């Protein structure tokens, strides 16, 4: 676990500013939909786990009392704080934290968010239990992450593809697995939606400063993917640029009052 934490910190510490400026992370249909489904209230305290560039924290902070933005990587927190403070925001505070072992009391928050980060976590079932623990009874968890197809061989191919580009990638899960994690942690599922997002290959590889030999290999894996992965990733050349698709899942769930 320490090795994974060190790897995540190294990968994202080196690339923190790229994630702040990344259009893939700063906006998108799934973030807009998360806001719409959650419908945050003015008196809420919100925890944003693995805030990255701070885009989710920024999206929610104008609608709630306070956002606590956490990340495992201090350089990422520093970059997010500069970005958010630069917008004149004063109701977001920042805290270094491990998503699977949160340094907060039970039942502290009205809402917990986490967006496009859990595929880096060592234990996603534990992460969901931690969300449940720090939520007030009846509180809401809203999570977005990369999604893989239910077929195991296809899921493995896509995860291996992601891990080749970013060694801190642990695993993207299926919809079935995510719903099990939430239900096992005592959540009632309120909504699930999926989104297909086109990725510019060069921009996607550039987020992790991938070198030319690795880019060639990633391109080869895209263009020679077996049928299931080829259907999911759907690589295509447009205007001399290579694009492919990743799928995201949005889960909005409520902590049941009876859950311990």
Residue ranges with predicted function:
Residues 125-140:
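A short glycine-rich, Lys/Arg-flanked "PGG" loop and its adjoining helix->strand segment in the class I
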Residues 47-101:
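Class I SAM-dependent methyltransferase SAM/SAH-binding core
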Residues 171-185:
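Short alpha-helix
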Residues 53, 124, 190-260:
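Conserved Class I S-adenosyl-L-methionine
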Residues 110-123:
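A short SAM/SAH-binding and catalytic strip from SAM-dependent methyltransferases
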Residues 100-111:
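A short acidic, Gly/Pro-enriched loop at the edge of an enzyme's catalytic core
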Residues 1-44, 55-59, 76-79, 86, 140-164, ...:
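Conserved class I S-adenosyl-L-methionine
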């Amino acid at each position: 676990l320490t090795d994974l934490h060190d790897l995540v910190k190294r990968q994202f510490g080196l690339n923190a500013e790229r994630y702040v400026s990344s259009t893939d992370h700063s906006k998108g249909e799934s973030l807009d939909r998360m806001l719409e489904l959650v419908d945050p209230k003015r008196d809420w305290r919100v925890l944003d786990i693995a805030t990255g560039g701070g885009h989710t924290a920024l999206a929610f902070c104008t609608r709630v009392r306070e956002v606590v933005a956490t990340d495992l990587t201090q350089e990422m927190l520093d970059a997010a704080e500069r970005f958010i403070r630069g917008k004149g925001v004063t109701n977001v505070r920042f805290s270094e934290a491990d998503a699977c072992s949160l340094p907060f009391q039970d039942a502290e928050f009205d809402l917990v968010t986490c967006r496009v980060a859990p595929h880096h976590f060592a234990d996603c079932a534990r992460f969901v239990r931690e969300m449940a623990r720090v939520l007030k009874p009846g509180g809401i968890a809203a999570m977005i992450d990369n999604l893989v197809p239910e077929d195991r061989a296809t899921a493995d191919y896509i995860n291996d593809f992601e891990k080749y580009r970013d060694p801190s990638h642990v695993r993207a899960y299926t919809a079935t697995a995510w719903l099990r994690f939430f239900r096992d942690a005592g959540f009632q599922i309120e909504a699930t939606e999926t989104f297909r997002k086109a990725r510019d290959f060069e921009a996607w590889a550039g987020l992790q400063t991938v070198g030319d030999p690795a880019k060639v290999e990633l391109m080869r894996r895209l263009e020679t993917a077996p049928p299931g992965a080829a259907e999911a990733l759907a690589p295509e050349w447009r205007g001399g640029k290579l694009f492919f698709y990743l799928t995201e899942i949005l889960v909005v769930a409520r902590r049941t009052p009876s859950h311990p």
